[in-house]
Amino acid sequence: LWIGTASLMPDDHIDGFRADVLALLRGLKAPVYRWPGGNFVSGYDWHDGIGERDKRPPRRNPAWTGVESNDVGIHEFMRLCELLDTEPYIAVNAGLGGVKEAADEVEYCNGAEDTPMGKWRKQNGQAKPWKVKWWSVGNEMFGDWQLGFMSTEAFVKKHNSFADAMWKVDSSIHLIAVGEVGRWDEMILANCADRMDLVSEHFYCQDWHGGGLMTHVLQIPRNIRRIAEAHRGYRKDIPALEGKDIRICMDEWNYWYGPHIYGELGTRYFLRDALGIAAGLNEFLRQSDMVFMANYAQTVNVIGCIKATTTDACYASTGEVLKLYREQFGTVPVKVDGELRPLDVAAAIRSSDQALTLSVINPGWEEVTFELDILGGQFEYQEKTCRLNGVATIYTLTGPDDMAYNTPGQESVVKVSEKSLKNTKQVKVGPFSANVIVLGTE
């Protein structure tokens, strides 16, 4: 008996991806996924992930620890996007990588079959171009931790040369420039505005036990607001932005702290973190005139919203809140008047059924009762009068306490419950909870 190779994949895998993790990813219904990162991309050669898997060269992880097997390359990432019915967003290596490498990557993904890279793609099993729309020119090139770090002045030239080469291959792609509030943004926006569609911003928040639950939660919306306000200022102060609508792509945002339980940087997330993420979603809605795209970072393990062991997987507390808001909360902002601390309240119309949805976050320790008044019991949406029909449901994410967390292989304790609201005039929300109220219309 001769055995060439033995597969360590579970027998129910789907094209190499774990079925249980794929099911959780599908539940999130994320509209776009960014790959391959992150600090990793500044030392990544996309050619390493092409061709037969068994012949791909393993490489030392250029940014973190361990070895990158290169089992997942462009083809596998695109297949994952197909399985999840989501859009791909590819970051090119603008650190140690060069202009030709980036342009070739665009051609490999989007070029016709008769182009050099298109022919190679066809040889590897994909004749039809993928037509990837979203591309970022590097990652966090403002930081000295980044492979290929250089001065702002030098990177301005590098960004423009990358953009010219990538657009020469495919003028329809949308380019996202590396951003960082301060002098970096001022230089990039002043000198590269004609060579970008969006500008990337990142932020991470730390543990604030000493400041209390509310302080911990409010870190996220305050950072979103800080960045959005900075860009409003740039529009006033930078002549190159006149007449342009270069909005923010917040393609990394999250909490990042705590012990590494799930492998390298594999942190645990608590209910208090989920409340902060919910508050962030409220703030993104309020700042949607400035923020075009927001990508929670990351997906599985590390600082992800899904936690997995070798045998089990589950939504972290942050995954539960992302799933809840994707399923129930609307996307068309509605003005909210009044204030009742400590509640954070936002409202949106759900375009699929014209329901009026409210997000109510209670980052406090006590139950809060508030009055809900929809003026006239109706609203206008897309030249139609929508009247409340009296059917109301409240979805509540909470747990035993603010430090509750979910563990793979165990019953989740941070989870969503659903109940009908009989009285929409007097609404009660429990302590340390994120709530989505859905008001039906006719």
Please tell me what each predicted stretch does.
Residues 1-185, 189-198, 224-225, 229-251, ...:
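Non-catalytic accessory regions flanking glycosidase/transglycosidase catalytic cores in CAZymes
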Residues 203-219:
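Active-site His/acidic residue clusters
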